């Protein structure tokens, strides 16, 4: 996967209200959503707070992310994250009928079409029958993975 890296883990989406200094020098309270790789809700909150060290921050919510796989791009133009829903297609061994398994990915890309192209690239290399069901933009600002930070 040239320029792409898949990372599997247990992810949490953490929403926080953060006081940040704007370009004009004014301070403003903004809501941000970050993704944290963690073992529990408490661990996710602790890691998010550590990343916001030095800021006035309140954690608003912590929820289990609907994905276990994050697809990162090394392209500097890929500055957003998208959720992509995919259905894997396989025959049911007992009935022989088509069986579909839904999976959600978080994909770093510059556009919706590029996110879907990245999914296609990964799935073709995996040689799995699939269909892309949906893709939507997210408000994710950053992904914190065991010592690494992917900022947008």
Regions found by a protein language model. Name each.
Residues 20-36, 46, 54, 97-105, ...:
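A cross-kingdom feature marking solvent-exposed beta-strand/loop segments within repeated
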Residues 53-63, 125-134:
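Short loop-to-beta-strand transition segments
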Residues 40-53, 111-127:
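A short, charged, amphipathic alpha-helix used as a generic interaction element across diverse proteins
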């Amino acid at each position: 996967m040239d320029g792409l890296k898949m990372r599997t883990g247990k992810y949490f989406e953490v929403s926080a209200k953060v006081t940040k200094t704007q370009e004009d020098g004014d301070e403003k309270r903004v809501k941000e959503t970050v993704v944290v790789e963690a073992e529990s809700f408490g661990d996710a909150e602790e890691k998010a707070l550590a990343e916001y060290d030095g800021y006035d921050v309140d954690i608003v919510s912590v929820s289990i992310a609907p994905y276990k796989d994050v697809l990162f791009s090394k392209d500097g133009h890929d500055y957003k994250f998208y959720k992509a829903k995919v259905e894997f297609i396989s025959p049911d061994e007992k009935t022989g009928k088509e069986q579909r398994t839904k999976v959600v990915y978080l994909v770093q890309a510059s556009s919706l079409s590029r996110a879907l192209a990245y999914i296609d690239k990964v799935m073709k290399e995996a040689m799995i029958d699939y269909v892309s069901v949906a893709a939507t933009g997210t408000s994710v600002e950053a992904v914190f993975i065991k010592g690494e930070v992917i900022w947008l």
